[in-house]
């Protein structure tokens, strides 16, 4: 057998080893016959001083690293070796190239080689296709340049100029014709419109004159003719009100309507004063039927004149009240309400009971008294959609079917109409309110600043020194643990800060108080155990640790590092 070659080595640790946490310098007697390479020496040191099997140790002799694959004969007697706990990912799967300068991983080298092979297979086709297309484009461009000669260029410019001139001449002729065609109907329409605007009263004046002539020639048929004329006039005015083409047309119609009824009422009053006997000779049945027809068509009845009997006035008043109810029921929508107001403005101020009747114009706003003896109020046609203040008519009826009508007074039947108390009501206030709000709204350029809470910068624990063994009690350490995540899958946690409460060197168990933030408490899941005590209280054993104190083996800690507090912090914490 070969003689044993024992060597005495002095080992210097950066941090106390797990087996002897109170010292960092040791003497070790090594038999070189048992240690063939430096790796054997490292495994011997790992075994003697309680390092875990996964801990990678590096041996340095006078500042130089002893390669793991070198012979252990490099170590001589009384040599001082520095033992350093290296990072794990430094020397895993490393390939040293001949120069020794570059360290490449096997996986990366394989991937690069595979990519190079694929590139060599696919590149020729791609390059050929790109070159092919580029050469094609270059050839086409060269051909185009060669084909363009100066003569051809001059010919093309001349032909283009001629074409442009021809197009311009044709375009001007066509445009002139089209403009003439367009202007001619427009001019005609404008002329007709101007004529109508200048003479809005001419057809009505003619109708009144014809009516007067017919009255003189045939006095008996004057009442019927007047009713027919009134029907025609009402239909024309309603049609013109329902379909206005523009604002100017509507204004002209308003003027004609405001002037027309007053003239018709004057003529009717004169005729009634001159021929009271002839009108009274007619049968009441015919008058009732004509009044009813007129009320159904127009929705409003003309008030009877002085010469008519009390029976005719009562029948016409009843029919007018019924027609008013029908018209008001149909005017639920804003458009119907607008049409209703316009028709009210048409017949405002026509026939009124009493000798002192005065005509009213439809453009008058609000309410006006018609006369001293009349005692009635007529609504003026207002441009807005809102209804007048009081639209009530007192006919002795006790029921108030429409709340927006005024409270009905009790007047003598056939004599005067009761004055309704003004009750303000607006049918369509939405558009007016919107406009008012838009005008009254004050635009404010106010910006609210939303600031996120200041994120605390994460500590870089990789700069802290690694721990080979458990430090002293009371020291703070940073470590990782293999634990279940919130989805109950095992994973390495982030760095946690903890304080060493106790350490057992024999069992290598460590009690650690976790100082970092714990996860928020939640309801127990499917992997959490719930126990019931005798008193009925529930005890939950979470699969994911929720406690601030843990007891683990030192080997279970991943990358334990010592947290070194700066002297400024320690001095500030100490009492002055």
From Swiss-Prot:
One of its GO terms (cellular component) is nuclear body. This is Coilin. Residues 125-330, 352-389 are annotated as: Disordered. The modification Phosphothreonine is found at residues 122, 290, 303, 456. The gene is COIL. The lineage of its organism: Eukaryota, Metazoa, Chordata, Craniata, Vertebrata. The keyword Lipoprotein does not apply. Residues 386-520 are annotated as: 2 X 4 AA repeats of S-L-P-A. It comes from Homo sapiens. Its main location: nucleus. Residues 270-285 have a biased composition (Basic and acidic residues). The keyword NADP does not apply. The atypical Tudor domain at the C-terminus contains two large unstructured loops, and does not bind methylated residues. Residues 460-559 form the Tudor domain. It is found in: Nucleus; Nucleus, Cajal body. Component of nuclear coiled bodies, also known as Cajal bodies or CBs, which are involved in the modification and assembly of nucleoplasmic snRNPs. Residues 223-271 are annotated as: 2 X 4 AA repeats of A-R-N-S. It comes from the Eukaryota. It holds the Pfam family Coilin_N. One of its GO terms (molecular function) is U2 snRNA binding.
